């Protein structure tokens, strides 16, 4: 049995098998459009920040100065 899915970008049907070079996308174009959306942050994985300042203090967390610039 062959599985058919919808391309996440354009919704065209895509056959899901070894011959599908761009799965789950229908083409390289749709694949690159999706990559561009991730790179421009149109897509993002939601993050829930459960770590409170108090917990960070208890763990001895100190903010790294590596990326800070001198003012």
Curated annotation (Swiss-Prot):
The lineage of its organism: Bacteria, Pseudomonadati, Pseudomonadota, Gammaproteobacteria, Alteromonadales. GO terms for biological process: regulation of DNA-templated transcription. It comes from the Bacteria. HAMAP family: DNA_gyrase_inhibitor_YacG (MF_00649). The gene is yacG. Inhibits all the catalytic activities of DNA gyrase by preventing its interaction with DNA. Acts by binding directly to the C-terminal domain of GyrB, which probably disrupts DNA binding by the gyrase. Binds 1 zinc ion. InterPro entries: DNA_gyrase_inhibitor_YacG (IPR005584), Znf_NHR/GATA (IPR013088). One of its GO terms (molecular function) is zinc ion binding. Zn(2+) binds at residues 7, 10, 26, 30. This is DNA gyrase inhibitor YacG. Its cofactor is Zn(2+). Interacts with GyrB. It holds the Pfam family YacG. Keywords: Metal-binding, Zinc. Belongs to the DNA gyrase inhibitor YacG family.
